[in-house]
Amino acid sequence: AKSLKSIAIIGPNADQVQFGDYTWSRNNKDGVTPLQGIKNRVNKNTAIHYAKGCSLTSLDTSGIAEAVEAAKNSEVAVIFGGSASAALARDYKSSTCGEGFDLNDLNLTGAQSQLIREVYRTGTPVILVLVTGKPFVIEWEKNNLPAILVQWYAGEQAGNSIADILFGEVVPSGRLTFSFPRSTGHLPVYYNYLPSDRGFYKNPGSYDSPGRDYVFSAPSALYSFGYGLSYTSFVYKNLSTDKDKYELNDTIHATVEVKNTGKYTGKEVVQLYVRDKASTYVTPVKQLRDFKKIELAPGETRTVQLQVPISDLYLVDEKNPVSYTHLRAHET
């Protein structure tokens, strides 16, 4: 933050506190906006160029030119988009998220997509921050922008907390609690989908090479449940269980070594998934059964133990025994 000479703060959620669904206030006096949070962190000599660019809902693009100029005059641009939510009885006309506010299309609302693309075309590095309570279709953003952060509705200290992450005071460690689809047409999309008689998704398509699952796309999520990145890196090894066979009342104790191989102290969410290898019933391709969040210093290694009661894996079948394979989801 101290080395930046200029930064563009852009977007409909840049100077607005989003407290979340069922919250009574939308007044910025009750919280810290992202714009204010960033101003609190940067050097006093850093130039802040703010431009709203567009609203969350309107198709009016007249403010985009100002945002483009702000980006051109800055070393980096941070765009705050997403959605808005509040108490059902207050300011409901500007809500795009929450109970009773469903979107028929999960593309970013209003002129947000155009704003992002025109700022991107300036050549200034762009960070997209989604302040939202729902997933959006952001495949273009994923393929073109160097960084995307999802903040959700962070409440009163939202501006200070996102500034801490943007400037490296805090290393991000969140994991998605639902999946982001590639398009609205890809819904429903789950991490724990049921396989068809063709098994796993093996033949995704593209315009250059049409496939079968989707002719011109992959049926998998753009970002799946459990996904999340960090400023540091982790390596897993020596996954093992305490026994090879278990009785009905037993609990599986699985251990794995996790090492922080990066330069920063960071938190990792160790996730244990299971998959039924053979069954007379159709079961999900994988299911999350346990997780633990740990903090490791650079170079530090820790053995993590995860537990799964056999009762959580029950499939009632008197004649055919079943076996499971342990999987882990580590996508940093």
Predicted feature residues:
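C-terminal non-catalytic regions of proteins with extracellular/luminal or membrane-system context
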Residues: 1-328
